[in-house]
């Protein structure tokens, strides 16, 4: 009922500001019950006792009813009466609450559009397709038959006012646009909002839902141009790839594309006609692969750059798009170095008394976890040195022994599960070695002992049961399928279809 009420209000007037004065908006933002299709971490609308406080929400709404304080906050960002002192608790608390509620409201038209599109097409919801690892089987199936790959980054930097203009299509009331600019004024010392994934991560620490929505709306507009070119250049629609893109919420984007095709534009689209082009994106990085010639992929690059520059009114760096031939190129995507390998294979063909040797080539998508980048991430998190030597974690020494073990085991399990698709398993062994010894050093430091003395006292089986759980489960899986011993199991690549979010240590690129 609440969802229908919000949707009707938004469709009738497209006014956002009145919804900010409703208490249930902030409850939805906190309890993460607005839409199960959107993966956000719960918002911290808490008081001093670390519990959800409806009283604080009511106080905030009462202050928002006082238009004088809100107007003065928009006109004078230096003396902000609404947020209070910028270093105070009330300032951060009020800013976070309003921005997260604002993000919930802005998701209404996009979420309702996605749900209606799914219902109209009657496409089943597959939980497996929401996994990040589901991209790699797709690449294994498609990239082996393609010739060129274009490794591109979503254009940035972008001026903050362009984001306001993008949302102006959905938001009609002026106070909401002023409130949006007010949030941007909090970060006036930054030149751009979307500069890198690190910047987005910094923003998401305080306002996860709001800034991730802004980032997704900007990427929406960037992909709008690509989908427009793709739809106009070829009228063939791929059902398999359409179902695959369910995880990235592209149904609403594909369904509501504006069909604008002028006569002068048809000549350009004819040169871009390619029925074997595939597009995959995660966050700010995308892969554009084609079976066509080098000239065709260069035309795609040329027109994408020009359309982006004309649409967003800023210069797009062409060097951010790298075009390479697939058999001779290794591209970085989702924490892996991927490349197409050609393996020569000799097949003996026996026909009656004659035998023939046939030389053939087999292609295979090889994925390798970059050990240098992973060690660099572990070094930044203070688990090891730059050279990969394990060190203790002093900040965790105030925790209990069980909590320290849980922290290390969780990080080790997440990293090893995510990089289980690597063909080089030595990287996983290196990760386990670093985290295991770092855990032992941390516990020894807490108990003011040496690692050797601590390990001798607890026995050689210390930590083994925590780190071998994954290997035991994998052994059971493979023993059910192959009747012979696990020869070459260390080379098997495994993709998990339940990973919906990249760990901070994994997102090292």
Curated annotation (Swiss-Prot):
It holds the Pfam family MatK_N. It is found in: Plastid, Chloroplast. The keyword Transmembrane does not apply. Belongs to the intron maturase 2 family. MatK subfamily. One of its GO terms (biological process) is tRNA processing. GO terms for molecular function: RNA binding. InterPro entries: Domain_X, Maturase_MatK, Maturase_MatK_N. One of its GO terms (cellular component) is chloroplast. The lineage of its organism: Eukaryota, Viridiplantae, Streptophyta, Embryophyta, Tracheophyta. It comes from the Eukaryota. PANTHER family: MATURASE K. This is Maturase K. Usually encoded in the trnK tRNA gene intron. Probably assists in splicing its own and other chloroplast group II introns. Keywords: Chloroplast, mRNA processing, Plastid, RNA-binding, tRNA processing. Its main location: plastid.
